Amino acid sequence: MCSGPRKPSTPPLPQQQKEATVMAASLLLELAAADDVAAVRRVVEEEKVSLGVAGLWYGPSASGVARLGMERRTAAMVAALYGSTGVLGYVVAAAPAEAARASETDGATPLHMAAAGGAANAVAATRLLLAAGASVDALSASGLRAGDLLPRATAAEKAIRLLLKSPAVSPSSSPKKSASPPSPPPPQEAKKEYPPDLTLPDLKSGLFSTDEFRMYSFKVKPCSRAYSHDWTECPFVHPGENARRRDPRRYSYSCVPCPEFRKGGSCRKGDACEYAHGVFECWLHPAQYRTRLCKDEVGCARRICFFAHKPDELRAVNPSAVSVGMQPTVSSPRSSPPNGLDMAAAAAAMMSPAWPSSPASRLKTALGARELDFDLEMLALDQYQQKLFDKVSGAPSPRASWGAAANGLATASPARAVPDYTDLLGSVDPAMLSQLHALSLKQAGDMPAYSSMADTTQMHMPTSPMVGGANTAFGLDHSMAKAIMSSRASAFAKRSQSFIDRGGRAPAARSLMSPATTGAPSILSDWGSPDGKLDWGVQGDELHKLRKSASFAFRGQSAMPVATHAAAAEPDVSWVNSLVKDGHAAGDIFAQWPEQEQMVA
Protein backbone atom coordinates (compact mmCIF):
# COMPACT_ATOMS: atom_id res chain seq x y z
CA MET A 1 0.00 0.00 0.00
CA CYS A 2 1.32 3.32 -0.92
CA SER A 3 1.68 6.05 1.53
CA GLY A 4 1.85 9.73 0.77
CA PRO A 5 2.44 12.91 2.74
CA ARG A 6 -0.12 13.68 5.48
CA LYS A 7 -2.49 16.49 4.66
CA PRO A 8 -2.69 19.38 7.16
CA SER A 9 -5.81 19.66 9.32
CA THR A 10 -8.61 21.85 7.96
CA PRO A 11 -8.73 25.32 9.64
CA PRO A 12 -12.04 26.29 11.28
CA LEU A 13 -14.47 28.07 9.07
CA PRO A 14 -15.01 31.81 9.62
CA GLN A 15 -18.63 31.22 10.52
CA GLN A 16 -17.71 28.81 13.27
CA GLN A 17 -15.10 31.18 14.63
CA LYS A 18 -17.64 34.01 14.70
CA GLU A 19 -20.15 31.92 16.60
CA ALA A 20 -17.52 30.96 19.16
CA THR A 21 -16.64 34.60 19.69
CA VAL A 22 -20.27 35.51 20.19
CA MET A 23 -20.73 32.72 22.73
CA ALA A 24 -17.60 33.75 24.64
CA ALA A 25 -18.72 37.39 24.70
CA SER A 26 -22.19 36.46 25.94
CA LEU A 27 -20.67 34.32 28.70
CA LEU A 28 -18.34 37.12 29.73
CA LEU A 29 -21.20 39.64 29.90
CA GLU A 30 -23.30 37.30 32.03
CA LEU A 31 -20.45 36.79 34.46
CA ALA A 32 -19.80 40.55 34.62
CA ALA A 33 -23.45 41.23 35.45
CA ALA A 34 -23.32 38.62 38.23
CA ASP A 35 -20.05 40.12 39.57
CA ASP A 36 -18.34 36.70 39.46
CA VAL A 37 -14.70 37.75 39.48
CA ALA A 38 -13.24 34.20 39.61
CA ALA A 39 -15.23 32.99 36.61
CA VAL A 40 -14.31 36.09 34.60
CA ARG A 41 -10.62 35.60 35.38
CA ARG A 42 -10.79 31.92 34.33
CA VAL A 43 -12.51 32.74 31.03
CA VAL A 44 -10.02 35.49 30.22
CA GLU A 45 -6.84 33.67 31.29
CA GLU A 46 -7.63 30.06 30.33
CA GLU A 47 -9.93 30.45 27.36
CA LYS A 48 -8.10 33.50 26.08
CA VAL A 49 -11.22 35.64 25.70
CA SER A 50 -10.41 39.30 25.23
CA LEU A 51 -11.82 41.79 27.72
CA GLY A 52 -12.60 44.16 24.85
CA VAL A 53 -14.95 41.78 23.09
CA ALA A 54 -18.47 43.23 22.69
CA GLY A 55 -21.76 41.42 22.58
CA LEU A 56 -25.41 42.27 22.27
CA TRP A 57 -27.04 43.17 25.58
CA TYR A 58 -30.63 44.14 26.31
CA GLY A 59 -30.72 47.21 28.51
CA PRO A 60 -31.03 51.01 28.70
CA SER A 61 -29.76 53.18 25.89
CA ALA A 62 -27.60 56.32 26.07
CA SER A 63 -29.88 58.26 23.74
CA GLY A 64 -31.60 60.18 26.57
CA VAL A 65 -34.96 58.48 25.98
CA ALA A 66 -36.27 56.11 28.61
CA ARG A 67 -36.33 52.99 26.48
CA LEU A 68 -34.74 49.53 26.47
CA GLY A 69 -33.12 47.86 23.49
CA MET A 70 -30.34 45.62 22.16
CA GLU A 71 -27.02 47.45 22.20
CA ARG A 72 -23.41 46.28 21.87
CA ARG A 73 -21.75 46.28 25.28
CA THR A 74 -18.40 45.26 26.75
CA ALA A 75 -17.75 43.60 30.11
CA ALA A 76 -16.77 46.96 31.65
CA MET A 77 -20.02 48.54 30.45
CA VAL A 78 -22.20 45.78 31.86
CA ALA A 79 -20.27 45.74 35.16
CA ALA A 80 -20.73 49.52 35.49
CA LEU A 81 -24.44 49.23 34.62
CA TYR A 82 -25.16 46.76 37.43
CA GLY A 83 -22.61 48.09 39.93
CA SER A 84 -20.38 45.00 39.78
CA THR A 85 -17.41 46.67 41.42
CA GLY A 86 -15.36 43.43 41.69
CA VAL A 87 -15.42 42.66 37.96
CA LEU A 88 -15.07 46.34 37.07
CA GLY A 89 -11.96 46.67 39.26
CA TYR A 90 -10.43 43.59 37.61
CA VAL A 91 -11.18 44.87 34.09
CA VAL A 92 -9.80 48.41 34.58
CA ALA A 93 -6.71 46.94 36.28
CA ALA A 94 -6.03 44.47 33.46
CA ALA A 95 -7.03 46.81 30.59
CA PRO A 96 -7.26 50.51 31.66
CA ALA A 97 -8.35 51.54 28.16
CA GLU A 98 -11.64 49.73 28.69
CA ALA A 99 -12.73 52.53 31.07
CA ALA A 100 -13.06 54.95 28.14
CA ARG A 101 -14.18 52.62 25.33
CA ALA A 102 -17.35 53.72 23.53
CA SER A 103 -20.08 51.44 22.21
CA GLU A 104 -20.35 50.84 18.48
CA THR A 105 -24.14 51.36 18.42
CA ASP A 106 -25.01 54.31 20.68
CA GLY A 107 -21.58 55.68 21.67
CA ALA A 108 -22.06 54.98 25.38
CA THR A 109 -19.05 54.61 27.69
CA PRO A 110 -18.88 52.70 30.99
CA LEU A 111 -19.32 56.05 32.75
CA HIS A 112 -22.59 56.60 30.88
CA MET A 113 -23.75 53.16 31.99
CA ALA A 114 -22.80 53.78 35.62
CA ALA A 115 -24.78 57.03 35.63
CA ALA A 116 -27.84 55.62 33.85
CA GLY A 117 -28.00 52.33 35.77
CA GLY A 118 -28.88 53.73 39.19
CA ALA A 119 -27.47 50.67 40.94
CA ALA A 120 -26.76 50.53 44.65
CA ASN A 121 -22.99 50.51 44.00
CA ALA A 122 -23.17 53.12 41.23
CA VAL A 123 -21.18 55.63 43.28
CA ALA A 124 -18.31 53.17 43.85
CA ALA A 125 -18.34 52.16 40.18
CA THR A 126 -18.15 55.83 39.16
CA ARG A 127 -15.14 56.36 41.42
CA LEU A 128 -13.37 53.37 39.87
CA LEU A 129 -13.95 54.62 36.34
CA LEU A 130 -12.86 58.16 37.16
CA ALA A 131 -9.72 56.86 38.84
CA ALA A 132 -8.98 54.79 35.72
CA GLY A 133 -9.18 57.90 33.51
CA ALA A 134 -12.77 57.97 32.26
CA SER A 135 -13.75 61.31 30.75
CA VAL A 136 -16.70 63.17 32.19
CA ASP A 137 -16.98 65.18 28.95
CA ALA A 138 -17.35 62.14 26.70
CA LEU A 139 -20.44 62.43 24.50
CA SER A 140 -22.72 59.67 23.37
CA ALA A 141 -24.15 59.37 19.87
CA SER A 142 -27.01 61.62 21.03
CA GLY A 143 -24.61 64.29 22.32
CA LEU A 144 -25.23 63.57 26.00
CA ARG A 145 -22.73 63.46 28.84
CA ALA A 146 -22.82 61.00 31.69
CA GLY A 147 -24.36 63.59 34.01
CA ASP A 148 -27.29 64.03 31.62
CA LEU A 149 -28.38 60.44 32.11
CA LEU A 150 -28.68 60.47 35.88
CA PRO A 151 -32.14 59.26 36.98
CA ARG A 152 -34.14 61.66 39.09
CA ALA A 153 -35.11 61.13 42.73
CA THR A 154 -32.59 58.38 43.47
CA ALA A 155 -30.25 58.03 46.41
CA ALA A 156 -27.13 57.96 44.23
CA GLU A 157 -28.05 60.88 41.98
CA LYS A 158 -26.58 63.67 44.06
CA ALA A 159 -23.41 61.80 45.00
CA ILE A 160 -22.66 60.89 41.38
CA ARG A 161 -23.36 64.44 40.26
CA LEU A 162 -20.92 65.77 42.82
CA LEU A 163 -18.28 63.27 41.65
CA LEU A 164 -18.74 64.34 38.05
CA LYS A 165 -18.30 67.99 39.07
CA SER A 166 -15.31 67.40 41.33
CA PRO A 167 -12.19 69.37 40.30
CA ALA A 168 -10.01 66.31 40.96
CA VAL A 169 -11.60 64.55 37.99
CA SER A 170 -9.33 64.41 34.98
CA PRO A 171 -10.90 66.14 31.96
CA SER A 172 -9.60 63.48 29.62
CA SER A 173 -8.81 59.81 30.05
CA SER A 174 -6.37 59.51 27.17
CA PRO A 175 -3.69 62.18 27.42
CA LYS A 176 -1.81 62.14 24.17
CA LYS A 177 1.72 63.40 23.93
CA SER A 178 2.27 66.03 21.33
CA ALA A 179 5.39 67.63 19.96
CA SER A 180 3.78 71.05 19.82
CA PRO A 181 3.10 72.89 23.06
CA PRO A 182 -0.53 72.75 24.16
CA SER A 183 -2.58 75.78 23.29
CA PRO A 184 -3.79 77.85 26.22
CA PRO A 185 -7.40 77.20 27.18
CA PRO A 186 -9.91 79.91 26.31
CA PRO A 187 -10.51 82.39 29.11
CA GLN A 188 -13.45 81.46 31.28
CA GLU A 189 -15.10 83.04 34.24
CA ALA A 190 -13.53 81.93 37.47
CA LYS A 191 -15.99 79.81 39.41
CA LYS A 192 -15.28 78.80 42.95
CA GLU A 193 -15.37 75.07 43.39
CA TYR A 194 -16.40 73.44 46.64
CA PRO A 195 -15.61 69.94 47.83
CA PRO A 196 -18.50 67.49 47.72
CA ASP A 197 -20.84 68.02 50.68
CA LEU A 198 -23.22 65.14 51.31
CA THR A 199 -24.87 66.95 54.23
CA LEU A 200 -26.65 69.41 51.94
CA PRO A 201 -30.29 68.46 51.39
CA ASP A 202 -31.62 67.31 48.06
CA LEU A 203 -33.65 70.11 46.48
CA LYS A 204 -35.70 67.69 44.39
CA SER A 205 -36.95 65.32 47.05
CA GLY A 206 -38.62 65.31 50.42
CA LEU A 207 -39.75 68.44 52.18
CA PHE A 208 -37.60 70.71 50.02
CA SER A 209 -39.57 69.86 46.86
CA THR A 210 -43.00 70.73 48.27
CA ASP A 211 -44.89 73.79 47.11
CA GLU A 212 -45.25 75.12 50.65
CA PHE A 213 -41.49 75.12 51.25
CA ARG A 214 -40.59 76.64 47.90
CA MET A 215 -43.13 79.44 48.13
CA TYR A 216 -42.58 80.46 51.76
CA SER A 217 -39.16 79.14 52.88
CA PHE A 218 -36.83 78.69 49.88
CA LYS A 219 -34.14 81.40 50.03
CA VAL A 220 -36.16 83.06 52.79
CA LYS A 221 -34.93 81.43 55.99
CA PRO A 222 -31.24 82.04 56.85
CA CYS A 223 -28.75 79.20 56.58
CA SER A 224 -27.28 77.89 59.83
CA ARG A 225 -24.10 76.37 58.35
CA ALA A 226 -20.97 78.10 59.62
CA TYR A 227 -18.64 76.78 56.90
CA SER A 228 -18.22 77.67 53.26
CA HIS A 229 -20.40 75.68 50.91
CA ASP A 230 -22.11 75.90 47.54
CA TRP A 231 -24.99 78.37 47.78
CA THR A 232 -26.63 77.01 44.65
CA GLU A 233 -27.10 73.63 46.35
CA CYS A 234 -28.44 75.11 49.60
CA PRO A 235 -32.15 75.98 49.91
CA PHE A 236 -31.52 78.68 52.52
CA VAL A 237 -30.39 82.26 52.14
CA HIS A 238 -26.90 83.56 52.86
CA PRO A 239 -25.61 87.08 53.61
CA GLY A 240 -25.25 89.07 50.40
CA GLU A 241 -26.90 86.44 48.19
CA ASN A 242 -28.73 87.80 45.16
CA ALA A 243 -31.34 85.03 45.35
CA ARG A 244 -32.66 86.34 48.68
CA ARG A 245 -36.45 86.52 48.90
CA ARG A 246 -38.84 88.35 51.19
CA ASP A 247 -41.34 86.21 53.03
CA PRO A 248 -44.71 86.68 51.23
CA ARG A 249 -46.47 86.23 54.56
CA ARG A 250 -44.62 89.15 56.18
CA TYR A 251 -44.16 91.52 53.27
CA SER A 252 -46.99 92.44 50.94
CA TYR A 253 -45.64 92.45 47.39
CA SER A 254 -46.92 91.20 44.07
CA CYS A 255 -45.37 88.95 41.44
CA VAL A 256 -44.92 91.90 39.07
CA PRO A 257 -41.18 92.70 38.57
CA CYS A 258 -40.02 96.00 40.00
CA PRO A 259 -39.04 98.39 37.15
CA GLU A 260 -36.42 100.15 39.26
CA PHE A 261 -34.86 96.89 40.44
CA ARG A 262 -34.65 95.55 36.88
CA LYS A 263 -32.75 98.61 35.70
CA GLY A 264 -30.22 99.13 38.47
CA GLY A 265 -30.38 95.99 40.58
CA SER A 266 -31.61 97.96 43.59
CA CYS A 267 -34.73 99.74 44.74
CA ARG A 268 -35.04 102.84 46.92
CA LYS A 269 -38.02 101.39 48.78
CA GLY A 270 -36.16 98.25 49.79
CA ASP A 271 -38.32 95.64 51.49
CA ALA A 272 -41.26 98.06 51.53
CA CYS A 273 -41.57 97.90 47.74
CA GLU A 274 -44.81 96.37 46.48
CA TYR A 275 -43.15 94.73 43.46
CA ALA A 276 -40.96 91.62 43.16
CA HIS A 277 -37.18 92.01 43.37
CA GLY A 278 -35.47 89.37 41.26
CA VAL A 279 -36.44 86.20 39.45
CA PHE A 280 -37.03 84.11 42.56
CA GLU A 281 -39.42 86.61 44.17
CA CYS A 282 -41.31 86.89 40.90
CA TRP A 283 -41.70 83.22 39.97
CA LEU A 284 -41.84 81.69 43.46
CA HIS A 285 -44.60 84.09 44.49
CA PRO A 286 -47.76 82.22 45.58
CA ALA A 287 -49.70 83.98 42.83
CA GLN A 288 -47.46 82.63 40.06
CA TYR A 289 -45.62 79.50 41.23
CA ARG A 290 -46.64 76.43 39.20
CA THR A 291 -49.53 78.12 37.47
CA ARG A 292 -48.18 77.16 34.03
CA LEU A 293 -46.84 74.00 32.41
CA CYS A 294 -43.12 73.56 31.86
CA LYS A 295 -42.11 73.31 28.21
CA ASP A 296 -39.80 70.36 29.02
CA GLU A 297 -42.50 68.62 31.10
CA VAL A 298 -41.18 65.41 32.71
CA GLY A 299 -37.81 65.75 30.97
CA CYS A 300 -36.96 68.95 32.84
CA ALA A 301 -33.48 68.83 34.42
CA ARG A 302 -33.58 72.13 36.34
CA ARG A 303 -32.81 72.08 40.04
CA ILE A 304 -35.59 74.51 40.91
CA CYS A 305 -38.30 74.72 38.28
CA PHE A 306 -40.98 77.37 38.64
CA PHE A 307 -43.47 75.50 36.46
CA ALA A 308 -45.60 72.37 36.72
CA HIS A 309 -44.46 69.24 34.89
CA LYS A 310 -47.85 67.51 34.86
CA PRO A 311 -51.38 68.87 34.57
CA ASP A 312 -52.20 67.59 38.05
CA GLU A 313 -49.33 69.67 39.48
CA LEU A 314 -50.90 72.94 38.35
CA ARG A 315 -51.97 75.18 41.20
CA ALA A 316 -55.32 76.95 41.07
CA VAL A 317 -54.87 80.49 42.37
CA ASN A 318 -57.80 82.76 43.18
CA PRO A 319 -56.81 86.31 42.14
CA SER A 320 -58.95 87.90 44.84
CA ALA A 321 -57.40 85.71 47.54
CA VAL A 322 -53.78 86.02 46.58
CA SER A 323 -53.17 88.99 48.73
CA VAL A 324 -54.98 86.55 50.95
CA GLY A 325 -54.24 86.58 53.67
CA MET A 326 -52.12 89.67 53.17
CA GLN A 327 -54.73 92.34 53.88
CA PRO A 328 -56.07 93.14 57.37
CA THR A 329 -59.70 92.21 57.80
CA VAL A 330 -62.14 94.72 59.29
CA SER A 331 -65.16 93.23 60.99
CA SER A 332 -68.39 95.17 61.06
CA PRO A 333 -70.79 95.17 64.03
CA ARG A 334 -73.26 92.34 64.12
CA SER A 335 -76.29 94.57 63.98
CA SER A 336 -75.01 96.94 61.28
CA PRO A 337 -75.08 96.36 57.51
CA PRO A 338 -71.86 95.56 55.57
CA ASN A 339 -71.28 99.21 54.77
CA GLY A 340 -71.74 100.31 58.37
CA LEU A 341 -68.12 99.86 59.40
CA ASP A 342 -66.76 101.17 62.64
CA MET A 343 -65.09 104.55 62.08
CA ALA A 344 -61.91 103.77 63.96
CA ALA A 345 -61.48 100.37 62.29
CA ALA A 346 -62.17 101.77 58.84
CA ALA A 347 -59.71 104.62 59.30
CA ALA A 348 -57.06 102.26 60.65
CA ALA A 349 -57.54 99.91 57.71
CA MET A 350 -57.19 102.74 55.19
CA MET A 351 -54.09 104.19 56.85
CA SER A 352 -52.32 100.88 57.49
CA PRO A 353 -49.18 100.01 55.39
CA ALA A 354 -50.90 96.91 53.99
CA TRP A 355 -53.74 98.96 52.47
CA PRO A 356 -51.91 100.07 49.25
CA SER A 357 -50.63 96.54 48.64
CA SER A 358 -54.00 95.15 47.59
CA PRO A 359 -54.27 94.14 43.90
CA ALA A 360 -56.75 96.94 43.15
CA SER A 361 -54.69 99.70 44.75
CA ARG A 362 -51.54 98.61 42.95
CA LEU A 363 -53.20 99.22 39.61
CA LYS A 364 -55.15 102.37 40.54
CA THR A 365 -54.18 105.72 42.02
CA ALA A 366 -54.83 106.47 45.66
CA LEU A 367 -58.00 108.23 46.76
CA GLY A 368 -57.81 111.98 47.25
CA ALA A 369 -58.14 113.51 50.68
CA ARG A 370 -61.51 115.02 49.79
CA GLU A 371 -62.92 111.66 48.64
CA LEU A 372 -61.58 109.97 51.76
CA ASP A 373 -63.27 112.50 54.05
CA PHE A 374 -66.53 112.03 52.17
CA ASP A 375 -66.35 108.24 52.56
CA LEU A 376 -65.67 108.53 56.27
CA GLU A 377 -68.64 110.89 56.70
CA MET A 378 -70.96 108.51 54.85
CA LEU A 379 -69.74 105.59 56.95
CA ALA A 380 -70.43 107.57 60.12
CA LEU A 381 -73.93 108.51 58.97
CA ASP A 382 -74.87 104.94 58.03
CA GLN A 383 -73.54 103.57 61.28
CA TYR A 384 -75.30 106.18 63.39
CA GLN A 385 -78.63 105.56 61.70
CA GLN A 386 -78.36 101.80 62.10
CA LYS A 387 -77.47 102.10 65.78
CA LEU A 388 -80.47 104.31 66.43
CA PHE A 389 -82.78 101.95 64.55
CA ASP A 390 -81.60 99.09 66.74
CA LYS A 391 -82.09 101.20 69.85
CA VAL A 392 -85.61 102.22 68.87
CA SER A 393 -86.56 98.64 67.95
CA GLY A 394 -85.63 97.41 71.42
CA ALA A 395 -87.62 100.07 73.30
CA PRO A 396 -90.95 99.15 74.99
CA SER A 397 -94.30 100.09 73.46
CA PRO A 398 -95.82 103.40 74.69
CA ARG A 399 -99.23 101.80 75.30
CA ALA A 400 -97.68 99.34 77.72
CA SER A 401 -95.64 101.93 79.59
CA TRP A 402 -97.90 104.99 79.78
CA GLY A 403 -98.36 104.72 83.51
CA ALA A 404 -94.73 103.88 84.19
CA ALA A 405 -93.60 106.65 81.90
CA ALA A 406 -95.75 109.20 83.72
CA ASN A 407 -94.22 108.26 87.10
CA GLY A 408 -90.72 107.93 85.70
CA LEU A 409 -90.79 111.31 83.99
CA ALA A 410 -91.95 112.95 87.18
CA THR A 411 -89.13 111.51 89.31
CA ALA A 412 -86.30 111.08 86.82
CA SER A 413 -83.26 113.32 86.98
CA PRO A 414 -82.24 115.49 84.00
CA ALA A 415 -79.25 113.23 83.32
CA ARG A 416 -81.60 110.31 82.69
CA ALA A 417 -84.00 112.06 80.39
CA VAL A 418 -85.70 110.17 77.61
CA PRO A 419 -83.42 110.06 74.51
CA ASP A 420 -84.43 112.05 71.46
CA TYR A 421 -84.50 109.99 68.28
CA THR A 422 -86.02 112.68 66.11
CA ASP A 423 -82.86 113.19 64.06
CA LEU A 424 -83.12 109.69 62.68
CA LEU A 425 -86.76 109.73 61.59
CA GLY A 426 -86.81 113.17 60.00
CA SER A 427 -88.49 114.92 62.98
CA VAL A 428 -87.23 117.20 65.72
CA ASP A 429 -88.11 118.26 69.27
CA PRO A 430 -91.39 116.94 70.79
CA ALA A 431 -92.51 120.52 71.43
CA MET A 432 -92.11 121.20 67.72
CA LEU A 433 -94.61 118.49 66.81
CA SER A 434 -97.18 119.94 69.22
CA GLN A 435 -96.64 123.41 67.85
CA LEU A 436 -96.98 122.03 64.34
CA HIS A 437 -100.41 120.72 65.36
CA ALA A 438 -101.34 124.15 66.56
CA LEU A 439 -99.99 125.77 63.41
CA SER A 440 -102.35 123.70 61.30
CA LEU A 441 -105.29 125.30 63.14
CA LYS A 442 -103.99 128.86 63.47
CA GLN A 443 -103.27 131.63 61.03
CA ALA A 444 -100.83 130.74 58.24
CA GLY A 445 -98.39 133.58 58.73
CA ASP A 446 -97.25 132.86 62.31
CA MET A 447 -93.52 132.73 61.59
CA PRO A 448 -92.08 133.90 64.95
CA ALA A 449 -93.53 130.81 66.62
CA TYR A 450 -91.69 128.55 64.22
CA SER A 451 -88.49 130.57 64.58
CA SER A 452 -88.50 130.05 68.32
CA MET A 453 -89.27 126.41 67.73
CA ALA A 454 -86.24 126.04 65.40
CA ASP A 455 -84.05 127.73 68.02
CA THR A 456 -85.27 125.22 70.59
CA THR A 457 -84.36 122.41 68.19
CA GLN A 458 -80.82 123.70 67.66
CA MET A 459 -80.35 124.10 71.41
CA HIS A 460 -81.71 120.67 72.14
CA MET A 461 -79.90 118.49 69.64
CA PRO A 462 -76.24 118.86 70.74
CA THR A 463 -77.23 118.27 74.38
CA SER A 464 -79.48 115.32 73.64
CA PRO A 465 -78.61 112.23 75.69
CA MET A 466 -78.36 110.15 72.52
CA VAL A 467 -75.94 112.57 70.83
CA GLY A 468 -73.91 112.94 73.95
CA GLY A 469 -73.72 109.20 74.42
CA ALA A 470 -72.75 108.63 70.83
CA ASN A 471 -69.28 109.91 71.55
CA THR A 472 -68.51 106.82 73.58
CA ALA A 473 -70.93 104.25 72.24
CA PHE A 474 -70.76 104.84 68.50
CA GLY A 475 -67.40 106.55 67.97
CA LEU A 476 -68.93 110.01 67.02
CA ASP A 477 -68.09 113.33 68.63
CA HIS A 478 -70.43 116.29 69.14
CA SER A 479 -69.20 118.16 66.09
CA MET A 480 -69.87 115.26 63.71
CA ALA A 481 -73.29 114.56 65.24
CA LYS A 482 -74.17 118.24 65.06
CA ALA A 483 -73.20 118.38 61.38
CA ILE A 484 -75.36 115.35 60.62
CA MET A 485 -78.33 116.65 62.57
CA SER A 486 -78.16 120.18 61.16
CA SER A 487 -78.64 118.85 57.63
CA ARG A 488 -81.77 116.98 58.74
CA ALA A 489 -83.10 119.99 60.68
CA SER A 490 -82.78 122.22 57.61
CA ALA A 491 -84.64 119.67 55.51
CA PHE A 492 -87.42 119.50 58.08
CA ALA A 493 -87.63 123.31 58.21
CA LYS A 494 -88.29 123.44 54.48
CA ARG A 495 -90.95 120.74 54.79
CA SER A 496 -92.62 122.50 57.73
CA GLN A 497 -92.63 125.77 55.79
CA SER A 498 -94.47 124.00 52.98
CA PHE A 499 -97.08 122.87 55.55
CA ILE A 500 -97.59 126.44 56.67
CA ASP A 501 -97.86 127.76 53.11
CA ARG A 502 -100.46 125.15 52.23
CA GLY A 503 -102.44 125.95 55.36
CA GLY A 504 -102.47 129.66 54.43
CA ARG A 505 -104.15 128.95 51.12
CA ALA A 506 -107.12 127.22 52.82
CA PRO A 507 -109.50 129.80 54.28
CA ALA A 508 -111.96 127.12 55.35
CA ALA A 509 -109.36 125.61 57.70
CA ARG A 510 -109.64 128.66 59.96
CA SER A 511 -113.40 128.17 60.29
CA LEU A 512 -113.23 124.52 61.26
CA MET A 513 -112.62 125.31 64.92
CA SER A 514 -115.37 126.78 67.07
CA PRO A 515 -114.57 129.22 69.86
CA ALA A 516 -115.27 126.56 72.43
CA THR A 517 -112.95 124.13 70.79
CA THR A 518 -110.24 126.73 70.43
CA GLY A 519 -110.39 127.53 74.06
CA ALA A 520 -109.68 123.92 75.14
CA PRO A 521 -105.90 123.41 75.02
CA SER A 522 -106.10 119.90 76.46
CA ILE A 523 -107.80 118.73 73.28
CA LEU A 524 -104.65 119.46 71.26
CA SER A 525 -101.96 118.67 73.79
CA ASP A 526 -102.86 115.18 74.92
CA TRP A 527 -103.21 113.46 71.54
CA GLY A 528 -100.06 111.37 72.06
CA SER A 529 -100.47 110.07 75.64
CA PRO A 530 -103.09 110.26 78.44
CA ASP A 531 -100.97 112.47 80.71
CA GLY A 532 -100.25 115.04 77.98
CA LYS A 533 -96.51 114.22 77.76
CA LEU A 534 -94.88 112.58 74.81
CA ASP A 535 -93.24 109.24 75.30
CA TRP A 536 -90.57 108.71 72.65
CA GLY A 537 -89.54 105.20 73.69
CA VAL A 538 -91.61 103.66 70.92
CA GLN A 539 -91.06 101.36 68.01
CA GLY A 540 -89.95 102.77 64.68
CA ASP A 541 -93.15 101.78 62.87
CA GLU A 542 -95.35 103.19 65.67
CA LEU A 543 -93.58 106.53 65.54
CA HIS A 544 -94.08 106.54 61.79
CA LYS A 545 -97.83 106.06 62.34
CA LEU A 546 -97.88 108.92 64.83
CA ARG A 547 -96.20 111.20 62.32
CA LYS A 548 -98.75 110.24 59.70
CA SER A 549 -101.61 110.86 62.13
CA ALA A 550 -100.21 114.33 62.79
CA SER A 551 -100.30 115.10 59.10
CA PHE A 552 -103.91 113.97 58.84
CA ALA A 553 -105.08 116.04 61.81
CA PHE A 554 -106.85 118.36 59.36
CA ARG A 555 -109.14 115.51 58.41
CA GLY A 556 -110.43 114.75 61.87
CA GLN A 557 -110.51 118.10 63.69
CA SER A 558 -114.26 118.53 63.09
CA ALA A 559 -115.27 115.32 64.88
CA MET A 560 -112.41 114.09 67.15
CA PRO A 561 -112.55 116.72 69.90
CA VAL A 562 -116.32 116.40 70.28
CA ALA A 563 -116.28 112.60 70.37
CA THR A 564 -113.45 112.18 72.84
CA HIS A 565 -114.10 114.94 75.36
CA ALA A 566 -117.55 115.15 76.92
CA ALA A 567 -116.68 118.19 79.03
CA ALA A 568 -116.11 120.38 76.01
CA ALA A 569 -118.67 123.00 74.95
CA GLU A 570 -121.32 122.35 72.38
CA PRO A 571 -119.83 122.39 68.90
CA ASP A 572 -120.47 125.29 66.58
CA VAL A 573 -122.22 124.01 63.47
CA SER A 574 -121.87 127.27 61.64
CA TRP A 575 -119.07 125.69 59.65
CA VAL A 576 -121.75 123.91 57.62
CA ASN A 577 -122.84 127.26 56.23
CA SER A 578 -119.30 128.09 55.30
CA LEU A 579 -118.98 124.82 53.46
CA VAL A 580 -122.20 125.48 51.58
CA LYS A 581 -121.29 129.05 50.75
CA ASP A 582 -117.71 128.46 49.83
CA GLY A 583 -117.61 125.11 48.04
CA HIS A 584 -114.38 125.91 46.30
CA ALA A 585 -112.50 126.35 49.56
CA ALA A 586 -113.80 123.05 50.94
CA GLY A 587 -112.69 121.27 47.83
CA ASP A 588 -109.30 122.89 48.25
CA ILE A 589 -108.90 121.33 51.70
CA PHE A 590 -109.80 117.85 50.50
CA ALA A 591 -107.44 118.25 47.57
CA GLN A 592 -104.57 118.92 49.96
CA TRP A 593 -104.88 115.60 51.83
CA PRO A 594 -103.11 113.40 49.21
CA GLU A 595 -100.31 115.93 48.89
CA GLN A 596 -99.79 116.01 52.66
CA GLU A 597 -99.76 112.22 52.79
CA GLN A 598 -97.06 112.03 50.11
CA MET A 599 -95.03 114.64 51.89
CA VAL A 600 -95.08 112.81 55.20
CA ALA A 601 -94.68 109.34 53.72
Swiss-Prot record:
Signal peptide: none
ANK-type repeats, residues: 71-101, 106-138
ZnF endpoints (C3H1-type): 252-280, 288-312
GO molecular function, one term: zinc ion binding
The keyword Chaperone appears for this protein: no
Pfam families: zf-CCCH (PF00642), zf-CCCH_AtC3H23 (PF25512)
Transmembrane domains' residue ranges: none
UniProt keyword list: ANK repeat, DNA-binding, Metal-binding, Repeat, Zinc, Zinc-finger
Name assigned to this protein: Zinc finger CCCH domain-containing protein 33
